[in-house]
């Protein structure tokens, strides 16, 4: 019964992706395009050459950070919807250090990354403290903090660190920018994201603290009864998840954008939440989901150029994947579905 449930949960995202592509192909056919040619051009645009692969991995990097942020928090049973705000606060502190400290090179890079992580963690901790000590709903608080961070970033690039007459900040010095990998668009920020993902995976599944954090997420009352400090782990989850998002903001600034401007980091936070859910809160799975979504976004441009299918079709496919996955996982947890799986398992045992 338990193994059958795990298998079904594993298959839900895969089936959701297939269904989303089937509907996407129907839409392409209605628009007068050949779905197979369109899908081929989508694949070529995302993975058809080393250059395209580099672009896909570069686009996936911020998504990996924000999805890991959501994954870590949700494992502790708290809903951190403030990944975007924490991402922005990390990038703001990183931008200030990179452009105003006078330090360049590797020391500046390390200082920027650490500063961004600290900023994201502190920004997230605000919601954690309000939840633990005042009983406030963390979802509402983190969403509100997203707006505050966005407005604060606007002040930064229009006034505080503005570069001349253009509403944008000064650019990160060349010596402080992250290096490209193999001459492609993807930078060492992607490598940092992978390392963070592996560290999160190791911590959650191979350390006693990670086990206790997951136990708190499964049942806070039972965890507290067994002597676990629930408040401590809730605060830890907010700090670490915020630090991951803040580190992502720093890496995005140093590796891809190089300056703050209107629209920087827009949507990354909620995209990360969706990808964490599709990856079923598994750190390594969320990395693959982030790369998949980035591939859809990068490949859609080539698909439009080759077949005339608008890039919005790719957006529809992404939305359908999210809807089908969430609906499927919710259905799997229904008592009736669990009972059906139990009867099916018993029949298989009897047949054997």
Segment roles from a protein language model:
Residues 33-37, 74-91, 132-141, 212, ...:
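Short, non-helical or kinked segments that cap or interrupt transmembrane helices
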Residues 27-31, 37, 44-101, 118-136, ...:
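Single transmembrane alpha-helix segments in multi-pass membrane proteins
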Residues 1-17, 218, 225-232, 300-352:
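Cytosolic-side transmembrane-helix boundaries in multi-pass membrane proteins
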Residues 239, 244-251, 255-319:
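Transmembrane alpha-helical segments in multi-pass inner-membrane proteins
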Residues 182-259, 283-284:
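Helix-loop-helix "hairpin" substructures at the membrane interface of multi-pass membrane proteins
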Residues 138-206, 313, 344-352:
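Transmembrane helix-bundle core of multi-pass membrane transporters
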Residues 18, 60-71, 86-92, 121-125, ...:
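Hydrophobic alpha-helical segments embedded in the membrane of multi-pass proteins
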Residues 2-11, 74-82, 103-106, 110-167, ...:
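Short loop segments and helix-boundary regions at transmembrane helix junctions
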